[in-house]
């Protein structure tokens, strides 16, 4: 699997590019800002961008979406339906043009195909109602649900601490030692988070 990442302004959001090099097909995850950097990351892959995947609808994860749609009109943009309202509110607040025709939704248990890659969708509410985690091969694209040594905030509009704990417990119960690629900060391993992350440890005891 092809894999690349950049940090995007304004809140140093990790934006990821995943792809199947044989099929020359890629997807961008959480293009939160710095559209010129996101576009450069896509173009240097020498693959065709097929979709935009959003782990949730907060502005620091969707800020470059409309710039990408200006360059690649009609590109599908996937988001969980429970976060459609936050995403649309963000568009209004930041005066982003509406590209609703490109909007798609995905939910728990869905599997997206990207060449030979299979992207598994887990609904992990808590940081936001529609937060998702994406699993592809041995990589966990965790959004703002799980961080290295921590977890996402739940005291934001739409946040729910109990739901977040349930989501962390679900992630902790997964088989395998995924590489955890969070929405902010450095990567980790799921085994390490199970052992040392106090939030995940607490969640798994409940």
PLM feature segments, named:
Residues 1-45, 133-143:
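Conserved beta-strand hairpin/beta-sheet module of binuclear metal-dependent hydrolase folds
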Residues 26, 33-113, 195-202:
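Active-site HxH/HxHxD metal-binding segment of metal-dependent hydrolases
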Residues 5, 17, 111-113, 118, ...:
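Residue-level detector of beta-strand face positions
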Residues 28-29, 50-57, 77-80, 123-126, ...:
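Active-site neighborhood of phospho(di)ester-bond hydrolases with catalytic His/Asp-centered motifs
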Residues 2-4, 48, 76, 104, ...:
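Conserved beta-strand segments of alpha/beta enzyme cores
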């Amino acid at each position: 699997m092809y894999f690349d990442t950049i940090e995007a302004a304004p809140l140093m959001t990790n934006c990821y590019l995943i792809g199947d090099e044989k099929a020359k097909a890629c997807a961008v995850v959480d293009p939160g800002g710095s559209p010129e950097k996101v576009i450069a990351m896509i173009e240097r892959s020498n693959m065709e961008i097929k979709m935009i995947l959003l782990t949730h609808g907060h502005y620091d994860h969707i800020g470059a979406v409309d710039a990408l749609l200006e360059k690649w009109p009609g590109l599908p943009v996937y988001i969980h339906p429970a976060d459609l309202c936050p995403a649309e509110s963000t568009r209004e607040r930041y005066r982003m043009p509406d590209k609703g025709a490109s909007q798609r939704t995905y939910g728990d248990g869905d599997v997206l195909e990207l060449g030979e890659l299979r992207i598994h969708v887990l609904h992990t509410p808590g940081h936001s109602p529609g937060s998702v985690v994406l699993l592809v091969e041995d990589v966990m694209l965790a959004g703002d649900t799980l961080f290295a040594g921590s977890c996402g905030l739940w005291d934001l509009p739409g946040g729910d601490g109990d739901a977040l704990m349930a989501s962390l417990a679900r992630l902790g119960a997964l088989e395998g030692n995924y590489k955890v690629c969070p929405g902010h900060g450095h990567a980790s391993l799921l085994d390490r988070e199970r052992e040392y992350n106090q939030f995940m440890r607490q969640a798994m005891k409940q």
